[in-house]
Amino acid sequence: MEGEAVEAIVEESETFIKGKERKTYQRRREGGQEDEACHIAPNQADGGEVVQDVNSGVQMVMMEHLDPTLLQMKTEVMEGAVPQETEATVDDTQIITLQVVNMEEQPINLGELQLVQVPVPVTVPVATTSVEELQGAYENEVSKGGLQEGEPMICHTLPLPEGFQVVKVGANGEVETLEQGELQPQEDPNWQKDPDYQPPAKKTKKNKKSKLRYTEEGKDVDVSVYDFEEEQQEGLLSEVNAEKVVGNMKPPKPTKIKKKGVKKTFQCELCSYTCPRRSNLDRHMKSHTDERPHKCHLCGRAFRTVTLLRNHLNTHTGTRPHKCPDCDMAFVTSGELVRHRRYKHTHEKPFKCSMCDYASVEVSKLKRHIRSHTGERPFQCSLCSYASRDTYKLKRHMRTHSGEKPYECYICHARFTQSGTMKMHILQKHTENVAKFHCPHCDTVIARKSDLGVHLRKQHSYIEQGKKCRYCDAVFHERYALIQHQKSHKNEKRFKCDQCDYACRQERHMVMHKRTHTGEKPYACSHCDKTFRQKQLLDMHFKRYHDPNFVPAAFVCSKCGKTFTRRNTMARHADNCSGLDGGEGENGGETKKGKRGRKRKMRSKKEDSSDSEENAEPDLDDNEDEEETAVEIEAEPEVSAEAPAPPPSKKRRGRPPGKAATQTKQSQPAAIIQVEDQNTGEIENIIVEVKKEPDAETVEEEEEAQPAVVEAPNGDLTPEMILSMMDR
């Protein structure tokens, strides 16, 4: 009974297919074309016949010696089983999954073979059958002797629309694109004799591809992606929803479609940070806030991420999970390990400057180096005009304001603001307690062995691309030799001014000197309108006039206690100071002449003149005090004497004092008055300076400053006047 039912079904299907063939030939004569991307013809030796259904969109192979049950999966057409039609646009992505069926093995989980949204003009019903029945029919055919084991029976050919791509996905996820030529068989000249044979039409692809990743355990799955981009022709295109071919199997897992294109990046709205993942952006945004939700239960310190907290906990426990493969060292974080290997083992410098030959291990150092080209100093001191290229130097500078000295000598407990200063102190003051490592190539003595390795690598390693001397054309392949050669140019005044006779050793000094000719003052004060030629002058101006916390430095002479605002001025004073109030020199008031004094005098005449003018001002004040304390008296005619010679005045270096002070001292007349003591009868000589007639304003000021002196009627001195003079 089953055989008769199968034969009836086959006859009906053959009748249906022949009717479709006639319609196909008629449409071909009218000049119509089919949309066909792949056509695989069977082998003529198998006695197969090509049967094609254009309206249904299904093309298959009929074989004379094939069991009818095997053909039921593709040929049986049930009337009345037409699925619902839905309109589909040509932009929808169509997917067909192809799997290899091996009839010799046991039943396996093949999933299902499903045709999805194949656009054709007419809807065609498709019946379903199980793969187990297909396998059973194949075994029966083999047992009857009709087929040999391993002989192929079925050849499926499906019409694929224009604009598709066939992709083969392996078991490990690798993707292989199959070209159109690989899908088509080699042409057989015998096929041209077949009246039903029609060569496939060549279509151009539009190069719009989509990848499908779909794998099963231990199997290779071929995935075809349909991407329709055909232009709409006249008329409406309907959609065929194909029924399930294998209904008893579970559907495969959904396939992820990953399209080609530019990778999406996420940008921070507060800075220039970009990243490929949203999670990285969310983690970065926490750096702009004070939120630190992850707290250490041992010390209470909080962190933004769990990773930072985990690394911090490793510092408490002493865990170092990241071990160096080249040595015995281990580190808390992977970044520390990478930095260690680059510094100690690989010597790799991946971050290179595009403007010069500089290369660095860390990206932060490269950014700092690039600022040396651009001149950018983004880190500004809030207390003065200092600006730095990196935060490290700014922190070091801030210690000059706060007075912090974090580095302590472990021998004498002296404290320093910089680690380099502390190391130099240890080498100079405590060399007996420090291990010394001598460089085998030069006279350098280094305290630590690791520093010796750095010295050998940087100073004495061979450089393939030689470095040129910046003063001449000499080229050296060793950094130490280059430095020693450049020292030979140290005392050469190679830079000469083209407008005067000035010459200097460094180029920056020549740049500053030329500003004296051009009048350029590039350094402007941010708080006032003053401009300066040098940065040091701007800093001095800012501290003196705009810094409320600035306290001028006082340089005190250790001999007489006099203070100066400049160190060099105090040094010149100390050379001639004898420790007395008068400030006379050690050689009886004579200035100390020497090489040091002559050099300083020739070096800065302007400073000497300004200092002499400042030093002359106290002399003027002293003279004014003497004038105020002088008493107006008339010399007695009976007793007269010549005024004694004035004491030797202090000789000052530099220009002579002002003319006003000299004239004041020389124009002061003096007189000697002999006074007899009433009790003892002794006569004392009193030297009195006679003051000239002052102006009216001066007289008023003196009258306000001191009480009026009462004179005797005859002009003689009263006892009160004499006592007041003796007291003074």
Swiss-Prot record:
* Any single Pfam family the record assigns to this protein: zf-C2H2_16
**Gene Ontology terms describing biological process:** regulation of transcription by RNA polymerase II
Q: Where is the composition biased (Acidic residues)?
A: 610-639, 696-705
Give the family per the record: Belongs to the CTCF zinc-finger protein family.
Q: Which PROSITE patterns match?
A: ZINC_FINGER_C2H2_1, ZINC_FINGER_C2H2_2
Protein keywords:
Activator, DNA-binding, Metal-binding, Nucleus, Repeat, Repressor, Transcription, Transcription regulation, Zinc, Zinc-finger
Top-level taxon? Eukaryota
What this protein is reported to do is described as: Chromatin binding factor that binds to DNA sequence specific sites and regulates the 3D structure of chromatin. Binds together strands of DNA, thus forming chromatin loops, and anchors DNA to cellular structures, such as the nuclear lamina. 3Defines the boundaries between active and heterochromatic DNA via binding to chromatin insulators, thereby preventing interaction between promoter and nearby enhancers and silencers. Plays a critical role in the epigenetic regulation. Acts both as atranscriptional activator and a repressor of the MYC gene.
Q: Where are the zinc fingers (C2H2-type)?
A: 266-288, 294-316, 322-345, 351-373, 379-401, 407-430, 437-460, 467-489, 495-517, 523-546, 555-577
Protein name, entry field: Transcriptional repressor CTCF
Grouped into one coarse class, the protein's main location is nucleus
- GO MF annotations in UniProt: DNA-binding transcription factor activity, RNA polymerase II-specific; RNA polymerase II transcription regulatory region sequence-specific DNA binding; zinc ion binding
Q: Name one GO cellular component term.
A: nucleus
Asked whether the UniProt record includes Repeat among its keywords, one would answer yes
* Segments for region (Disordered): 180-213, 573-678, 694-728
* Amino acid composition bias (Basic residues), ranges on this chain: 202-212, 593-604
- Spell out the subcellular localization from the entry: Nucleus
Q: Which residues form a coiled coil?
A: none
